[in-house]
């Protein structure tokens, strides 16, 4: 099976308002714009018992094994929402920890891919467990 290719665009907050804080998360409202800058994600189904995630590119150094993409897959596996395992290669063109949403947008785009390909059914409430940014970019998720 060949890889599916996904572009994961950087986003920038044009305005940001913190509404409240619950636990370690902030409830925010924001005006954002997507940039032409993007990471490239390759994804394919594999015959393995674990997902494989690999980061390449000039901004891949220092990305920890516990990251937004691995958290996404861990939650999906814990909830038994996905039948198969996937190999994911992410070419990092977006610098890390720059406030451009690189990791969150990577997870959001992978989740959006799984939803659009009808490989997963997930509720918006469950997406919030992963990231607010994931909810922002996954419009096909179920409301309830």
List PLM regions with ranges.
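DPxDG-like acidic metal-binding loop motif
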Residues: 98-127, 131
